[in-house]
Regions:
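A contiguous, basic/glycine-rich beta-loop/short-helix subdomain that forms a polymer-engagement track
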Residues: 121-154, 164-173, 301-442, 453, ...
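Conserved interdomain hinge at the start of the Helicase C-terminal
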Residues: 382, 439-478
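N-terminal targeting/trafficking signals and adjacent low-complexity tails
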Residues: 604-654
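A substrate-engagement module of RecA-like helicase motors
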Residues: 12-15, 19-154, 217, 223-235, ...
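Conserved RecA-like ASCE P-loop NTPase motor core of nucleic-acid helicases/translocases
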Residues: 14-21, 392-396, 471-478, 604-606
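Signature of the SF2 helicase/ATPase Hel1-core->accessory helical subdomain module
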Residues: 23-26, 30-34, 127-128, 134-155, ...
Length: 654
């Protein structure tokens, strides 16, 4: 941070520090930068979080209100914003007091009140439901206050997803040419970019018909009550009706075709091998791309026109139409992007994964279509590498298996003039400070042996807890299912376990720190997100337990399509996909232990494949050099498996 600030000041640029997720972002914003301000008093910094992390003051006022008139107004605006019970209303009233008195900045992560996801979804908003400058609360809105601060800040803390969205829309952040961009935990960037560019949309025929009918009525309302100066040709009722009718017929045809690929009347998924659509489906997608883009343009034209009429019309009626048109624009934008991507055979020189899903909610069937590129190097080149002059990508795991090749393939980065790939030696003496322990497990951590393996793991873990050699411990799992199984085996130790999901991560870490500093034993238990950005030094963390080598899931449509493509190129998917990803994960997990010259301890890895498989040695060679020990494991008898088998057999008989 300090060199970045110095260079940014010298070059008169804005330093943007981006990290992998909101938790790491908030750590820099709430802890690291306030600490730096003590030695750089005039430092101006802020954070750029996504809109969904901020409270919407309009929604908060409605949910905190007990006034019927407020609810009547929101009903007219088509917003169902009423508290479910008195406790919710009181909580919202308290939050409003905190916001109004500046005790809270409106960011979900910065309140000590527990807000469940259901309530927060109504307290926050999204782009489609935001009135923007037309909102009565615009000036004091936490989201827009934070956005205005960005223009004055020297340092902006962001996350990769927000940076990608900002570069795509050319909004939020200063101009790319005026940035010094640092991408921390940069190994996540290709995956984040791929997720950001994934397009999904509902295409259920009856639902689509309803949306088109509502849009036609909305356009008619605009033409009648808020007529623009020049009438768009597509706003002509007959032309718009014909346009929407053609669009619906294509959607209905697509539904019929997709239903042939999926078992009738139940939840299902169909992936198109290598992303290759039948010719008939490809032609439908190409036509849908054109038709939805025209509706997107019409909605955008009306929205811009409506935004200029706020001073000359009934504000409540206008706001209602603005909200509805904004939501219509959001829908047609998504549809247009989806069908454009579906119409492509390749993106960044690789296939586009395409699949359809059918889900059943409340007895109703919904059909969705999804597209995502396997590679996003062209998009990263356009949005980042070519547009921002100075970028630093950092991470403990830019290399996997001691090579930059996976990063280069996924990100499109190459050794060009002025670009450098640098691997720095660790300043720590791992041989003296720690060791790796691979217990002599009887079972490999495969799905068929999961119950026995976790029972063995729990027995060894219990032995370590009872030895009382370590105050601070961390247990990392590859899946939530395995974590919950483990917790069933150690119910008597539950009070000392701080488990992911019990509270927000930063609160669990604070509680862990307090416990250890007061001489109590404390164990953090979590998934892969706990393996990154967790900085606990010395006695705060002296033993890390790793459930198994974390290979990526093999049932993802993207992973399966990439595997097909690699095989078509005579490449081995395990070598290109699975092993580098597992190496990334293992390096991050092991890296939690030694964080300073005063750190010490052990990393326990419950996976004997590190010693028995050929790839195990390669994974170990990519780690810091620790001594390796192989102690025995207490013998355990697993009875649960037999019971489960009996139950399953009983179910089959019925």
């Amino acid at each position: 941070l300090i060199p970045g600030i110095a260079i940014a000041r010298e070059e008169q640029k804005t330093l943007v520090v981006s990290t992998a997720n909101v938790a790491l972002q908030d750590q820099i914003y709430s802890k690291d930068l306030p600490l730096l301000r003590k030695i750089i008093p005039d430092l101006r910094f802020t954070a750029a979080f996504g809109r969904g992390r901020y409270v919407c003051p309009r929604n908060l006022t409605a949910l905190a209100s007990t006034e019927p008139s407020q609810q009547d107004l929101l009903a007219f605006l088509d917003d169902d914003l009423t508290p479910n019970n008195q406790a919710e209303q009181k909580l919202c009233a308290t939050l409003k007091q905190d916001l109004d008195s500046y005790r809270w900045d409106g960011l979900r992560d910065h309140t000590d009140k527990a807000i469940d996801d259901g309530l927060w979804s109504r307290l926050s908003t999204d782009k489609a439901s935001c009135l923007n400058r037309n909102c009565h609360y615009y000036r004091e809105c936490p989201f827009f206050v934070a956005r205005r601060e960005i223009q004055e800040a020297e340092v902006v803390v962001a996350n990769h997803a927000l940076v990608m969205a900002a570069m795509e829309s050319e909004a939020v952040l200063p101009e790319p040419k005026n940035l010094l961009l640092v991408l921390d935990e940069g190994h996540h960037l290709p995956d984040v970019a791929r997720d950001a560019l994934e397009m999904s949309a509902e295409i259920t025929a009856p639902w689509f018909r309803l949306q088109l009918d509502l849009f036609c009525k909305l356009v008619a309302t605009c033409m009648e009550q808020f007529r623009p100066k020049t009438t768009p040709p597509l706003a002509n009722p007959e032309r718009l009706t014909a346009h929407c009718e053609e669009l619906f017929e294509l959607i209905a045809s697509l539904n019929n075709i997709l239903n042939l690929y999926m078992p009738a009347g139940q939840e299902a998924e169909h992936r198109f091998p290598m992303g290759e659509l039948p010719q008939e489906v490809m032609e439908i997608c190409q036509r849908l791309a054109k038709l939805t883009e025209l509706l997107r343009g019409l909605a955008e034209l009306f929205l811009n026109d409506l935004s200029e009429k706020t001073g000359s019309h009934d504000v409540v009626r206008l706001h209602r139409v603005l909200l509805q048109m904004n939501r219509a624009l959001g829908m047609f934008e998504s549809q247009s992007k989806l069908w454009r991507l579906a119409s492509l055979a390749q993106s960044s020189g690789a296939p586009v994964t395409k699949w359809a899903t059918r889900v059943v909610r409340d007895g109703q069937i919904h059909v969705w279509f999804h597209c995502v590129g396997i590679r996003v190097s062209d998009q990263l080149e356009r949005l980042l590498w070519r547009s921002v002059p100075h970028i630093v990508v950092t991470s403990a795991t830019l290399r996997s298996l001691n090579s930059f090749s996976r990063l280069q393939e996924m990100s499109g980065l190459k050794e060009k003039a002025g670009d450098r790939f640098v691997a720095l030696d660790s300043p720590f003496n791992h041989v003296e400070q720690g060791k790796i322990i691979i217990p002599q497990m009887r079972y490999e951590p495969l799905i068929d042996n999961e119950e026995q393996h976790i029972a063995e793991m729990a027995a060894y873990f219990r032995q370590q807890v009872e030895s009382k050699k370590h105050l601070g411990m961390l247990v990392l799992f590859a899946s939530g299912r395995a974590m919950n199984r483990f917790l069933e085996h150690v119910t008597d130790l539950r009070l000392m376990l701080l488990v992911q999901g019990d509270q927000p991560r930063y609160r669990l870490v604070e509680l862990h720190r307090k416990r250890v500093e007061s001489g109590e034993r404390s164990v953090l238990v979590g998934l892969q997100s706990f393996a990154e950005g967790l900085d606990l030094k010395g006695d705060l963390l002296s033993q890390v337990h790793i459930h198994k080598i974390a290979f990526p899931p093999i049932d993802s449509p993207v992973v399966i399509t990439e595997g097909e493509w690699l095989k078509s190129l005579n490449r081995y998917p395990f070598e290109v996909q699975s092993l580098p990803s597992a190496s990334f994960n293992l390096i991050q997990q092991v890296g939690r232990l030694i964080r300073s010259h005063n750190c010490w301890g052990e990393v326990v890895i419950y996976d004997k494949r590190l010693l028995t498989k050929n790839y195990g040695a390669r994974l170990l060679n990519a780690l810091p050099v620790f001594p390796i020990e192989q102690p025995g494991v207490p013998e355990v008898i697993v009875k649960r498996k037999a019971k489960q088998t009996a139950k399953q057999t009983g179910r089959k008989r019925r």
